[in-house]
């Protein structure tokens, strides 16, 4: 058998790279003709040749071996042709030589392989698709309006509520135009530096005259409408604060006169109490005036928190000035009691103070009840959560003032009856303790408000259901709705959009006949990529339009919602 195998190999004139060792399983003396047919299959793969006995447990049952080879050919692009060839089985070694001499019968089998779009590597920085507004192009790249007229203009959705769309330019086009105008990046940098220095010098000259500076800003349109802070003091919390300032100022003046005339420690505490109330209410008026100012670039969400800040400082002031001085004067009265003069005038002033403080208290209570009813909350809950910090301070201060007048009058009466000045000193300590409790409550409630407090759960549920009832929304997650003060709410949520509904919304605006014609014209992967990129970008724009629509719907149905952030999940 071996000579026949060698002859067959020589006749075929093929270079065999290797010939595996043969392990005869029977001796030559005992080899029968049937046993000598043990070597039946020859497997050829490239330059590797191997002879496998038919009695091998894995291959002995095979009647033939298939030879697979692949030829990569360009058909269009990205396709491969897979050719499958059949190799017949050989009964003898002589048959091997004859078959090797004869040409193999090939039955090619064409298999189409999917074309895969090659992934693009954009790198860590890619700005070729960035857009830039005309104002930024002129300021940052030192261009003129005439330079921008030569560039491609693109209309995009506006991020502002007052305009539907605006014009932008490709940043790469603007950069190329700036290099064309200025010649090099170094020349552009020098020009920007010169312009910045000239602008600084120009502004410094203008600051010397405030009237010219205002005219300059109005001419350029850089200022927004000025807020009318005077009107806030004629209604709502501002009106309550102004009434309290006037009444407490008069009470403070008369109480100090009574203290100077009588020398009473309780009257001194009441005078200090009225003085601290007047100062704190002046601070509240400043906070109200600041809170209605128009937002600026440094404070995009406005100044509404100034009410909480002024109320917090007011609470600290009550503790330091009111409670501290009252305790000090009461302790000094206990350690060094002084004789008290006639208390008739003191009683008259306390009576007048009780009436005036009570009137202010009623004004504050009515204002808080009206606001609580508008919010759908109970009076107690509205006060405890400090929804209206300025009016809340007035309410607590006037409540403490009324109770303080009662405490002072009681202790002064005991002193008049018994002649013991210790009762008057105890009254001073009682008023100081009352002021300390009020200040602690104000500090706590306003600190909670400044940390960021959620709105009512019922209101959050209503906003969430409004989004979930929209067909384009699958689910809402991570909802956060915080109170910004002055009845303003900020709403944030993660939205899981239904891609099919968004895509259908886009398709409803398209011409199906034209799209079908475009699909039929697609023949190559490049044309398919262009088709998909075109409509994919439009679908993304449709998704952005859906976000804008939902935000406008939320603000329209809930006027208290001023800022909406919907994140696509």
UniProtKB/Swiss-Prot annotation:
| Reaction it catalyzes | Zn(2+)(in) + 2 H(+)(out) = Zn(2+)(out) + 2 H(+)(in)
Renumbered to this chain, the signal peptide range is: none
In the database record, which residues form the transit peptide?
Answer: 1-68
The entry's cellular-component GO terms read: cytoplasmic vesicle; endoplasmic reticulum; mitochondrial membrane; nucleus
Where's it found, cell-wise? Mitochondrion membrane; Nucleus; Endoplasmic reticulum
Highest taxon of the lineage: Eukaryota
Report the residue ranges where the short sequence motif LXXLL motif is annotated in this entry. 463-467
UniProt-listed InterPro entries? Cation_efflux, Cation_efflux_TMD_sf, DNA-bd_dom_put_sf, SLC30A9, XPA_sf
User: Which cysteines link up through disulfide bonds?
Assistant: none
Q: Which GO terms describe its molecular function?
A: antiporter activity; zinc ion transmembrane transporter activity
Main location as per UniProt: mitochondrion
Q: State what this protein does.
A: Mitochondrial proton-coupled zinc ion antiporter mediating the export of zinc from the mitochondria and involved in zinc homeostasis, zinc mobilization as well as mitochondrial morphology and health. In nucleus, functions as a secondary coactivator for nuclear receptors by cooperating with p160 coactivators subtypes. Plays a role in transcriptional activation of Wnt-responsive genes.
Binding partners and assembly = Interacts with GRIP1, ESR1, AR and CTNNB1.
**Stored NCBIfam families:** CDF (TIGR01297)
Q: What is this protein called?
A: Proton-coupled zinc antiporter SLC30A9, mitochondrial
Upper lineage: Eukaryota, Metazoa, Chordata, Craniata, Vertebrata
Please name the gene that encodes this protein: SLC30A9
């Amino acid at each position: 058998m071996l000579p026949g195998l060698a002859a067959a190999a020589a006749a075929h004139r093929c270079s065999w790279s290797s010939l595996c060792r043969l392990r005869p399983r029977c001796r030559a003396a005992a080899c029968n003709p049937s046993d000598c047919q043990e070597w039946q299959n020859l497997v050829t793969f490239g330059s590797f040749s191997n002879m496998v006995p038919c009695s091998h447990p894995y291959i002995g049952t095979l009647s033939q071996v298939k030879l697979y080879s692949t030829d990569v050919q360009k058909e269009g692009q990205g396709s491969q042709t897979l050719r499958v060839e059949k190799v017949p089985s050989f009964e003898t070694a002589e048959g091997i030589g004859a078959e090797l001499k004869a040409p193999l019968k090939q039955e090619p089998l064409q298999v189409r392989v999917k074309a895969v779009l090659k992934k693009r590597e954009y790198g860590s920085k890619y700005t070729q698709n960035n857009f830039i507004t005309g104002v930024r192009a002129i300021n940052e790249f030192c261009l003129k309006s005439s330079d921008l007229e030569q560039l491609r203009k693109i209309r995009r959705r506006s991020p502002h509520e007052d305009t539907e769309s605006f014009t932008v330019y490709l940043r790469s086009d603007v950069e190329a135009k700036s290099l064309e105008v200025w010649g090099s990046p170094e020349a552009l940098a020098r020009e920007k530096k010169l312009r910045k220095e000239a602008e600084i010098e120009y502004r410094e000259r203008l600051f010397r005259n405030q009237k010219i500076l205002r005219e300059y800003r109005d001419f350029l349109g850089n200022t927004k409408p000025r807020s009318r802070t005077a009107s806030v003091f004629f209604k709502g919390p501002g009106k309550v604060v102004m009434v309290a300032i006037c009444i407490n100022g008069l009470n403070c003046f008369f109480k100090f006169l009574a203290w100077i005339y009588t020398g009473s420690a309780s009257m001194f505490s009441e005078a200090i109490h009225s003085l601290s109330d007047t100062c704190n209410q002046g601070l509240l008026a400043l906070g109200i005036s600041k809170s209605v100012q128009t937002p600026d670039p440094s404070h995009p969400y406005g100044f509404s928190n100034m009410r909480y800040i002024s109320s917090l400082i007011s609470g600290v002031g009550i503790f330091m000035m009111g409670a501290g001085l009252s305790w000090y004067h009461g302790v000094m009265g206990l350690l060094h009691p002084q004789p008290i003069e006639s208390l008739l005038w003191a009683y008259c002033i306390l009576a007048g103070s009780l009436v005036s403080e009570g009137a202010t208290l009623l004004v504050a209570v009515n204002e808080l009840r009206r606001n609580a009813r508008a919010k759908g909350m109970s009076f107690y809950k509205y006060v405890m959560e400090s929804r209206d910090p300025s009016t809340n301070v007035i309410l607590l201060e006037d409540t403490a003032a009324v109770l303080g007048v009662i405490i002072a009058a009681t202790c002064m009466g005991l002193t008049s009856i018994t002649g013991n000045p210790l009762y008057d000193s105890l009254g001073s300590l009682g008023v100081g303790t009352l002021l300390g409790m009020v200040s602690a409550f104000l500090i706590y409630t306003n600190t909670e408000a400044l940390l960021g407090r959620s709105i009512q759960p019922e209101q959050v549920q209503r906003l969430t259901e409004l989004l979930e009832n929209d067909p384009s929304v699958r689910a809402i997650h991570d909802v956060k709705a915080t109170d910004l003060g002055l009845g303003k709410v900020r709403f944030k949520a993660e939205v899981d959009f239904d891609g099919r509904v968004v895509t259908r919304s886009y398709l409803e605006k398209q011409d199906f006949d034209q799209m079908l014609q475009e699909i039929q014209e697609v023949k190559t992967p490049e044309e398919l990529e262009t088709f998909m990129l075109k409509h994919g970008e439009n679908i993304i724009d449709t998704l952005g339009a859906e976000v804008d629509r939902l935000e406008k719907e939320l603000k329209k149905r809930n006027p208290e919602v001023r800022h909406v952030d919907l994140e696509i999940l």
